[in-house]
Each structure stands twice: as structure tokens, then as C-alpha cells.
């Protein structure tokens, strides 16, 4: 395994050389140089008179002396067979990763950096030594194929060097197996004496085999491995017996305490070089990395992962620290044990021991530690670890006193809490405190000896301990409890329903704590709800939210704070990614419980109900649009059938319990969906027309006029904001207006279309175009509506006693009322005064009603096109035509006889097509009003003289009037005049109405206008 690389390797390999080297390595792996299948411990010693010390043997960068001129064959062999091939393979993988990097500028920068440095330094020592490049190195090392190559190179290299430079191969002072002897205590203790080549004793090594109660460590992939046996070697710190150098290379053991085969052997090597006094000094330690320890005590054994297997090294944590201190002293460096400890212990992101590079000159120095992320730390859990993001680690990220939670828990829960509290007291970095709490939570949930009930009890105790710990800041308490909750969430062994109970208990602890502020309590509550909503099945989620809600209601919080907490629960449910149906259920349950417990204020109830209504509306909208799409994309359905079905859906929406605003949103989605469909524009316009008609004709009792207008505006907004082209939207806008008029919608409904356009998010030019389309549709519809006013009279005799509409009904009533009066006057018998007076008044009232109805009808038409409705063409037309209308009315007034007036109507209002329809119709409206007003005045005026009656009626003789009966005489005069004027003016009104029918039929209906007598 190689986390670091020698900066001074001086050979670059061609592809052919690499292939040749790889073949040699494969051959080395297949060789059997000794009869033993197991790997042996080895050592190499030299006397004090040796020309140079033997360098260490390791695949780790910096462990080879940085003297490029060295002629030591072992050094060269290590460089050429281990270090440089590993570096070449690593650079090759880094370049592949850079080619796939999204940030192309950074990728190109790093590629150039590598290429330029290779020209100056083929070993790329600067690149590998730059902390800024760790993320690229780490990412490359994550590649499984590369890792296999590096491990293969390392194993083959060790084997080659040990065999080539062994005593058995004839190398003077070379490596030779350690002969353990003096077995004591049933083979638990062994020893060997190490001598230099002069036969002088350098030291005695003691080895102790420890057969322990199995403990568990985790591999990088999260799987657990039990260690049942390991050994400890008492590596010497000071050597003062004899002169010379010594290199001890001890094979790493498998998890069961046995030695691996030679082709898989890896070693822990201690390098003792001759010091100034000739005595060996510990100058360097070489081992595969990252090195980890199975605990925090000095007796914790070291272990590594290599080739997917766990191996223990013959050194404890205490011995390793002692050796490291000696290495740094002998290198002339000060020792920072806290820093060394930081690097030794791997928790969270992996960290390794500092790399101590022995120098061959007096000016030697310690190379800066280099880090990598490769093998995860010890963990007592079988939970798969999530891969860490490649990044440049910080030297202070690791907690040197991180708890071995599994070991602590093996005693009792109180032991675990004691360890946790001790760590929290000692550690001031909140991030490390949280790591400690999370590690403890993991140990609790993965303790194989505990049942579910015990795990629940212990996890709750840990949460309570976190909340009440005085060494944690409020924010750290929040983060600590959240870490416990996150551990519960990620645990794969605890059933979700059991998790929901843990969540409820955690909420109860946090809310009832006197050591937290409301803000912190709410933050913990929200995290708990998040975890509850993340459970896998709906039953567990419902149980979690119900439990949390109950915990809030039963807590010792004030009623106001309880309401606030329930609102927080509801908000979390509301913004979750669950289905609307499940949201309805969960939020409805929270609301129901809150109302029943009387902890929600009216305002809070209203807010939660509004959120519930929105969820309901969203679900309704979703369901509705699905139905609409099914209808639109039905290939066997005609446009007429599509329209009918979508009208039915629209009607159901309008009849629903939602608010008008929500109904508007749904209708907007309907029209938007129709507009965005692939149907022909004319078909879409027909469907939209049906929607408009359905809204306009909907019952006023269930949907008020303002709400209809609001919904109609939404319908138009759905059209105008669709992605279809502008001409199609214009056509659909016209269709919507047509639907309004088909449904007899009033001016407010029509104006709402303009409001929908104004409130849309389209640009101004499109808004103007759509308003023009709406106004054009309104004008065309007005013509149709005006003609419909007389539709009931077409083809009918005015004298027939049949139902009439509006003005024509009243006109017929006048005729029916006046005829008996005329007939009575023409008979010789005297009329009854009271009856005549009554008829006069009724006639006057009817005529007034005619006038009012005419004015009202015309004003209604005008209101549809008024300036408030944004129908600007009406204003322009009024400005242009008002003068012409006045001229025509004035000219009509100059005609004294009925015949002249009828001729004027025909010539100027029917035949003269140079005048606009608008001008002619307005003239007729005004003349009708004048005629009705004139007759009303005639009926009510009692001072008209007999001769006026005779002149007007065409009589040539004056009849004497009895002075004895003045009342009758007066009645005769008034009624006589009234009779004449009404009869003639009714003829004029009939002519005006015929003219209007004719004008209206010019573009709408070519049938012959009805002639009125």
C-alpha cells in the first residue's frame, strides 16, 4: 500500500519497460524461493565499520534516503521495483481522472503541471509533496484496479528485495529469518538475540502472543472483521550494547494471528542506523499505511487493511508513540506528541502517522507529513460506510482521544457514558465532540448483545446525556442530538416502527429539558420530524409523526410554545416530498390532535387548515389535469366530445369545496393544459369556449359573480401563459369570450378576461395583441346579442297575444291597453271617468317602463365595451360618431308627418350604407328614447285643447263641449290627443325597430327584417 512516494526516484519508464516490469513482478509472485509457505520475520545488521548504513525497505515515499547519488543496491532495488512503478501507475490514473473532470480549466492546469514537472524532475516529487494535490491522489487511490496494482507491486517488491538481498542468497550482512527461541508460558512469550556481523549482541527482542476476546474492526467497505489473536514485539528504543546498524522487518499477521503466505506478506520495519557514538539509533519506521489502532489506550494494537484483508502489526499504540518520539529526536527534530497522536489515530477521515525521512547528512530534516483518505477508521458497527468526498484533509480534523465506543459498551452503558463525558470534557472542538457522540450512538445500535428494548433505552440515555452535558455549547447540543438522530436514520438493523419510538422519546427529552432554549428545542424537533418522514413505509412515518405530536402535547412547554412546535411539525410535513395524499393524512392528524388538546390558537388552526387546503388543492389539481390529459389525448374522441367532458370536469371543480382562489388555480391549469396540447388551434378554441360557457352559466348561489370573474381571469391567464404561439392564444381568447356570451355572462365576467391578460407574466406587446383579440370578440358578440333582442318577434304578428321580450313585450302591452280606450271613445256611450283615468296612468307607466328598459338594454351593451373593460375602439367610435348621431336626430325632428319620418328612417338608417352600423344603431336608440319620452309627456299633460286634438287627428268639425261635465270633457281631450299621438308614434317605433333589425342582419342574418305596424 502506498500513500506516499519517494520524491527522488530517478527513472522514467517507457510503456515497453512497464510491461516488462509487470511481467517480472508476476513471475516474482509465482516464485517459491524457500520451502516455507509462511512469511518470516527478518533482520539485517552491519558492523560499525560498515561503509554505509542500509536504508529502509518500504513502498512508502520518503522512507528512502533522499540522496540521489547513493550507490546502495538495496536502495536502488526498492526505488526501481516498488516506488517508481507505483508512482507511474498512480500518475496514469490521475491523468485519466483529470480527463473526466468537469472543471476543464483545473484539469488542464494540473495536466500541464504534471507534464512540466516531469521534464525537470521525473520523480514528480513536488507534485506528490504538494498538499493541494492530495485530492487528486486520493481520488486515484480509490480506483480498485489501481489499488490492486499498487498492492501487487508492493508485495512483489518486498519479496524480491528480501530474497535478492538475503543472507541465503549470499548477500553479506543480508536479511535473514528471525529465530525465535526460549519459549515461555505455553508459547505466549518468545525471544531472540540480535547480533551484528561481528557477533556482538545488539539487543534482545521479546515477542508476546495475545489471545484476546474477539473484537471487531471495519474494513473500507464497511464489513466487519474479528481479531482474535495478535502479537506484540518490544522494539528497543535505546541501543547501547554494541556498534553497528540494525533493520528489523516484522511480518504483519492475519486477523486470526497466523502468518500470511509469502506472496501476500507485508512488513513493519524499524531502521536503526549507526549514530555518532557508533551505537544504533532508531532513525525511521516503515509500514504500509494508513496505520490504525484498535482503541485509545497505550495497549491498543496496530492494524492495517491491505488487499481487502485486515492485518495486525506487532506494535502497540504506546510503543509506536515511544518509537516515533525517538525517531524525531534522532532526526534532530522537536517532538509534538499531540500532533503525532492526531495523525496516528484514524477516526472520521483517515489520517496517518507522520512520515519520517532519515537523512544521510548532518543537515537532515523531517519531511512534512502527507495524508491520504484510503481506509476507514475502526468502527464497532457493521453499517456500510459512505464513501468520503475527495478533498484536501486538514491536519487538525482528527480527535486523538476519540472513544472506542464498542469497547466501552462491552462493560455497561454507564461505562460508555463515562467515556463519552470524559471525551467531551477534554475535547473543545465541537466537531470532534459530535463525532464522539455519533460513534457512541453507532456502537449502541450495533451492539449484537442488546435487544431492541435495550437499544432504545440506551440511545435515549445517550440523547439525554448529550442534552444535559455542561461541556457542550447549545449549538453543539443541537448538533449532537442531530447526530444521534442521523445515526438512528441510517441504521439498517432497527425496524422503522422501533425507530419511531426512539424519535418520540428523543423529542420528549429535548422538549422537557431545562438546559435548552426554545430555539434549540425547535431545531431538534425539526430534525426529528425529518428523520421520521424519511422512514421507509407510510405506517412507520405515520407512527413517527403521531408519536412526535403526542410528545409535544404532553411536554411541559407552555400552551403557546406547544402550538409553535406543532406548527413546526406541520411545516415540515408540508414541505416534504411525500405524496399529497400522505401529506393530507399526516397534517390532518397533527391538526386534529392539536385542536382536541386545545394547544393551537385560532390563527394557528387557520394557518394549518390553509396548508391542508393547499395540499388538497394540489392533489385535486394533479388528478384533474390527469383526467384532462386523458381526454385530450384520446384518439377516438371528437372535439365535441372532448369539450363536453372537459366542461363536466370544469363544473365539478366549480362545485367543489375549495376556495375561489384554488378553483381558479385549477381552472387555470385546465386551460393551460388545453392550450399546450397538440390539438388544432380551432379545436382548442372550441374546448376553451366550452370552459368559458360553463363558468358563466354556473349557479350564482354556489358561485358569486365576483368569484366567477376571478375564476374567469384565471382561465384566461392559463391560456395566455401557455407556450403555444400567439395566433393560437388569440383564437382561444376569442373562444373564451364567445363562451361567456353563450352563457349570458355579464360585463363583469367579460372584463375579467382583460384582468387575466393584465396579470399574466407575458410581455406587453403580447398583452396588447390579446386584448385586441378579446375586444374584437366582444364587438362581434355584441352584434349577435343585440339581434337576439328581437329574435322572439321574427315571423310573428305584433298583434298576436304571445310572449314577447323586453321592449317589444311592453310595446304590445301599450297597444293592448290603448285599443280599448280608442274603441270606447268612438262609441256613443259616455266613458267612465275613473276607468279612463286609470288607463291613462297605466299607459303612462308602461311607456315609462319601455323607456327605462330600452335605456337599460343599451347601457348594458355599452358597459360590455366600456373603457373599464379596456375596449378602446368604443371611445374612438363615440368620438367620431357622436356628432353624426346628433345631426341625424336633429334632421329627423324636422320631419312633421309620420310619412316623412318613415321615409327618413329608410333613406338614412337602412339604405345609407356609408354610415357605420354603430352610428345608425345609436341614432335608432336615441330616437326610440325620444319617442317614448314624448308619448309619456303627452299622456300626462291635461291642458291640451280640443282644436289641437282635431287638428292632429285630422277632424274638420268642432263638436260642442258640455260645460256641465268638465271632467268628462277634460278626459275626452286628453285621451283623444293621447290616442292620436300613441298610435302614430307606435308606427314610428315600429319603423325604427324594423330598421334596427335590418342593420343587425347585414352581417349576421340575411333574412328579411320583421315589419312592425
UniProtKB/Swiss-Prot annotation:
Transmembrane segments: none annotated. Residues 1-73, 348-396 are annotated as: Disordered. Its main location: cytoplasm. The keyword rRNA processing does not apply. The gene is sca4. Residues 12-27 have a biased composition (Basic and acidic residues). It comes from the Bacteria. One of its GO terms (cellular component) is cytoplasm. It is found in: Cytoplasm. Keywords: Cytoplasm. It holds the Pfam family 120_Rick_ant. Residues 47-61 have a biased composition (Low complexity). It comes from Rickettsia rhipicephali. Residues 62-73, 348-373, 380-396 have a biased composition (Polar residues). The keyword Cytoplasm applies. This is Antigenic heat-stable 120 kDa protein.
Amino acid at each position: 500500500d502506498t500513500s506516499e512516494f519517494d520524491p527522488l526516484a530517478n527513472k522514467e519508464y517507457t510503456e515497453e519497460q512497464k510491461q516488462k516490469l509487470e511481467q517480472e513482478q508476476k513471475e516474482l509472485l509465482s516464485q517459491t524461493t524457500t520451502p516455507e509457505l509462511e512469511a518470516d520475520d527478518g533482520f539485517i545488521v552491519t558492523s560499525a565499520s560498515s561503509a554505509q548504513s542500509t536504508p529502509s525497505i518500504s513502498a512508502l515515499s520518503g522512507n528512502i534516503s533522499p540522496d540521489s547519488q547513493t550507490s546502495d543496491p538495496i536502495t536502488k532495488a526498492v526505488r526501481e521495483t516498488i516506488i517508481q512503478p507505483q508512482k507511474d501507475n498512480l500518475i496514469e490514473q490521475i491523468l485519466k481522472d483529470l480527463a473526466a473532470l468537469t472543471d476543464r480549466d483545473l484539469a488542464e492546469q494540473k495536466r500541464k503541471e504534471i507534464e512540466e514537472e516531469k521534464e525537470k524532475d521525473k520523480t514528480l516529487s513536488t507534485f506528490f509533496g504538494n498538499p493541494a494535490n492530495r485530492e487528486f491522489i486520493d481520488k486515484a487511490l480509490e480506483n480498485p484496479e489501481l489499488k490492486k496494482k499498487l498492492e501487487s507491486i508492493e508485495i512483489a517488491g518486498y519479496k524480491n528485495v528480501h530474497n535478492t538481498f538475503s543472507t541465503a542468497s549470499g548477500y553479506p550482512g543480508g536479511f535473514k529469518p528471525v529465530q525465535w527461541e526460549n519459549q515461555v508460558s505455553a508459547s505466549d512469550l518468545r525471544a531472540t538475540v540480535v547480533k551484528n556481523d561481528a557477533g556482538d549482541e545488539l539487543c534482545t527482542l521479546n515477542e508476546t502472543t495475545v489471545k484476546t476476546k474477539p473484537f471487531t474492526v471495519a474494513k473500507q467497505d464497511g464489513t466487519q472483521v474479528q481479531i482474535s489473536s495478535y502479537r506484540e514485539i518490544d522494539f528497543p528504543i535505546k541501543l547501547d550494547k554494541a556498534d553497528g546498524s540494525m533493520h528489523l522487518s516484522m511480518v504483519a499477521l492475519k486477523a486470526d494471528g497466523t502468518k500470511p503466505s509469502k506472496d501476500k506478506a507485508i512488513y513493519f520495519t524499524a531502521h536503526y542506523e549507526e549514530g555518532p557514538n557508533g551505537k544504533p539509533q532508531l532513525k525511521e519506521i516503515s509500514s504500509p499505511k494508513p496505520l490504525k489502532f484498535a482503541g485509545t489506550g497505550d495497549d491498543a494494537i496496530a492494524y492495517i487493511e491491505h488487499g481487502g484483508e485486515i492485518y495486525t502489526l506487532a506494535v502497540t499504540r504506546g510503543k509506536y508513540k515511544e518509537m516515533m518520539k525517538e525517531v524525531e529526536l534522532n532526526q534532530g527534530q522537536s517532538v509534538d506528541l499531540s500532533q503525532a497522536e492526531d495523525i496516528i489515530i484514524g477516526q472520521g477521515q483517515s489520517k496517518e502517522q507522520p512520515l519520517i525521512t532519515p537523512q544521510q547528512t548532518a543537515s537532515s530534516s523531517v519531511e512534512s507529513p502527507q495524508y491520504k483518505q484510503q481506509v476507514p477508521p475502526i468502527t464497532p458497527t457493521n453499517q456500510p460506510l459512505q464513501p468520503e468526498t475527495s478533498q484536501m484533509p486538514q491536519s487538525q480534523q482528527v480527535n486523538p482521544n476519540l472513544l472506542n465506543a464498542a469497547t466501552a459498551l462491552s462493560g455497561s452503558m454507564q461505562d460508555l457514558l463515562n467515556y463519552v463525558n470524559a471525551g467531551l470534557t477534554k475535547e473543545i472542538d465541537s466537531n470532534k465532540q459530535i463525532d464522539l457522540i455519533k460513534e457512541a450512538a453507532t456502537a449502541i445500535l450495533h451492539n449484537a448483545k442488546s435487544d431492541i428494548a435495550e437499544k432504545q433505552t440506551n440511545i435515549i440515555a445517550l440523547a439525554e446525556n448529550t442534552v444535559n452535558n455542561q461541556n457542550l455549547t447549545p449549538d453543539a447540543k443541537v448538533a449532537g442530538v442531530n447526530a444521534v438522530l442521523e445515526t438512528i436514520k441510517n441504521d439498517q438493523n432497527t425496524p422503522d416502527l422501533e425507530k419511531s419510538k426512539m424519535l418520540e422519546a428523543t423529542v420528549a427529552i429535548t422538549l422537557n429539558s431545562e438546559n435548552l432554549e426554545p430555539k434549540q428545542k425547535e431545531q431538534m424537533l425539526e430534525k426529528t420530524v425529518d428523520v421520521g418522514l424519511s422512514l421507509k413505509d407510510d405506517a412507520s412515518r405515520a407512527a413517527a409523526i403521531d408519536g412526535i405530536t403526542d410528545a409535544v402535547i404532553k411536554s411541559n412547554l407552555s400552551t403557546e410554545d406547544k402550538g409553535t412546535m406543532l406548527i413546526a411539525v406541520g411545516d415540515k410535513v408540508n414541505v416534504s416530498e411525500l405524496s399529497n395524499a400522505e401529506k393530507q393524512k399526516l397534517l390532518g392528524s397533527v391538526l386534529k390532535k392539536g385542536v382536541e388538546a386545545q394547544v393551537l390558537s385560532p390563527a394557528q388552526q387557520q394557518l394549518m387548515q390553509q396548508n391542508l387546503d393547499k395540499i388538497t388543492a394540489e392533489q385535486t389539481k394533479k388528478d384533474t389535469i390527469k383526467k384532462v390529459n386523458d381526454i385530450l389525448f384520446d384518439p377516438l374522441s371528437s372535439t365535441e366530445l372532448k369539450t363536453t367532458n372537459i366542461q363536466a370536469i370544469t363544473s365539478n371543480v366549480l362545485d367543489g369545496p375549495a376556495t375561489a382562489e384554488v378553483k381558479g388555480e385549477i381552472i387555470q391549469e385546465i386551460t393551460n393544459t388545453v392550450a399546450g396540447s397538440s390539438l388544432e388551434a380551432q379545436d382548442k378554441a372550441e374546448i376553451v369556449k366550452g370552459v368559458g360557457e360553463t363558468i358563466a352559466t354556473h349557479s350564482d348561489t354556489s358561485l358569486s359573480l365576483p368569484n366567477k370573474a376571478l375564476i374567469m381571469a384565471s382561465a384566461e391567464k392559463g391560456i395566455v401563459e401557455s407556450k403555444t404561439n400567439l395566433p393560437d392564444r388569440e383564437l382561444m381568447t376569442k373562444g373564451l369570450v364567445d363562451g361567456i356570451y353563450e352563457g349570458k355572462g355579464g360585463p363583469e365576467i367579460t372584463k375579467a378576461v382583460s384582468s387575466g391578460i393584465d396579470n399574466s407574466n407575458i410581455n406587453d406587446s403580447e398583452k396588447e395583441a390579446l386584448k385586441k383579440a378579446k375586444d374584437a370578440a366582444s364587438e362581434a358578440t355584441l352584434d349577435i346579442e343585440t339581434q337576439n333582442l328581437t329574435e322572439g318577434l321574427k315571423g310573428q304578428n305584433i298583434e298576436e297575444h304571445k310572449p314577447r321580450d323586453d321592449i317589444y313585450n311592453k310595446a304590445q302591452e301599450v297597444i293592448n291597453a290603448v285599443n280599448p280606450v280608442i274603441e270606447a271613445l268612438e262609441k256613443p256611450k259616455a266613458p267612465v271617468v275613473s276607468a279612463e283615468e286609470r288607463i291613462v296612468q297605466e299607459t303612462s307607466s308602461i311607456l315609462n317602463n319601455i323607456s327605462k328598459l330600452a335605456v337599460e338594454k343599451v347601457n348594458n351593451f355599452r358597459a360590455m365595451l366600456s373603457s373599464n373593460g379596456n375596449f378602446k375602439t368604443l371611445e374612438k367610435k363615440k368620438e367620431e360618431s357622436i356628432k353624426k348621431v346628433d345631426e341625424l336626430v336633429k334632421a329627423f325632428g324636422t320631419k312633421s308627418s309620420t310619412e316623412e319620418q318613415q321615409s327618413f328612417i329608410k333613406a338614412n338608417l337602412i339604405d345609407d350604407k356609408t354610415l357605420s352600423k354603430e352610428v345608425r344603431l345609436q341614432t335608432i336608440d336615441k330616437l326610440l328614447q325620444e319617442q317614448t319620452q314624448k308619448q309619456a309627456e303627452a299622456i300626462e299633460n291635461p291642458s291640451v285643447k280640443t282644436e289641437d286634438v282635431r287638428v292632429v287627428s285630422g277632424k274638420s268639425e268642432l263638436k260642442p263641449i258640455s260645460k256641465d261635465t268638465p271632467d268628462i270633457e277634460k278626459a275626452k281631450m286628453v285621451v283623444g290627443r293621447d290616442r292620436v299621438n300613441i298610435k302614430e308614434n307606435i308606427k314610428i317605433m315600429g319603423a325604427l325597430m324594423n330598421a334596427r333589425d335590418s342593420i343587425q342582419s347585414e352581417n349576421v342574418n340575411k333574412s328579411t327584417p320583421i315589419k312592425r305596424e
